[in-house]
């Protein structure tokens, strides 16, 4: 392997964690503009292909040595209900901005270990998402 090439790319880089990425964030975003943009993008995506959801479930009982995710290591499963209730409240905020029923094409569960959550709690979450 070329040592120069290795040294060139052996540097820390930011992880892709959000869109838009952090350098494009600013404090002057107007709520009305954001809501209008959300509605427009939602309608375009929903009519064309449906929407994809990413639900961040950050809990794990143990740490994987390779993990770079935003996670919380715990064996206390009492956090499940509180966290899922918060996700459902947030979903309802977004849902109130949608003028039509979302066509959900895919759901990605990630962050920590989705299997940290009981099957019953995951079912409650998915029912709340799909009942809208």
Where are the model-predicted features located?
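Flexible, acidic/Gly-rich N-terminal and inter-domain linker regions that tether
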Residues: 1-51
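Short strand-loop junctions, especially beta-strand C-caps/beta-turns
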Residues: 22, 70-72, 110-112
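Short, glycine- and charge-enriched coil/turn segments that flank and shape catalytic ligand pockets
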Residues: 38-49, 77, 96-103, 131-132
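Canonical Radical SAM [4Fe-4S] cluster-binding loop centered on the CxxxCxxC motif
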Residues: 50-83
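Conserved, mostly hydrophobic/aromatic
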Residues: 60, 87, 109
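Non-membrane alpha-helical structural segments and their capping/turn regions in soluble enzymes
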Residues: 81-88, 119, 123
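A short, N-terminal amphipathic alpha-helix
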Residues: 87-97
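Conserved glycine-rich "GG(E/T)P / GGGxP" loop and the immediately following alpha-helix
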Residues: 98-132
């Amino acid at each position: 392997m070329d040592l120069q090439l290795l040294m060139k790319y052996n540097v820390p880089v930011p992880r892709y964690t959000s869109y838009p990425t952090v350098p494009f964030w600013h404090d002057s975003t107007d709520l009305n503009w954001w809501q209008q943009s959300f509605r427009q993008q939602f309608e375009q995506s929903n009519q064309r292909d449906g929407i994809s959801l990413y639900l961040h479930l950050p809990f794990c009982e143990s740490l994987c040595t390779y993990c770079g995710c935003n996670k919380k290591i715990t064996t206390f499963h009492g956090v499940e209900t509180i966290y899922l209730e918060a996700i459902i409240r947030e979903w309802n905020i977004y849902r109130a901005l949608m003028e039509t029923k979302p066509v959900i094409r895919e759901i990605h569960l990630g962050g920590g270990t989705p299997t940290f959550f009981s099957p019953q709690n995951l079912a409650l979450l998915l029912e709340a998402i799909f009942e809208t």
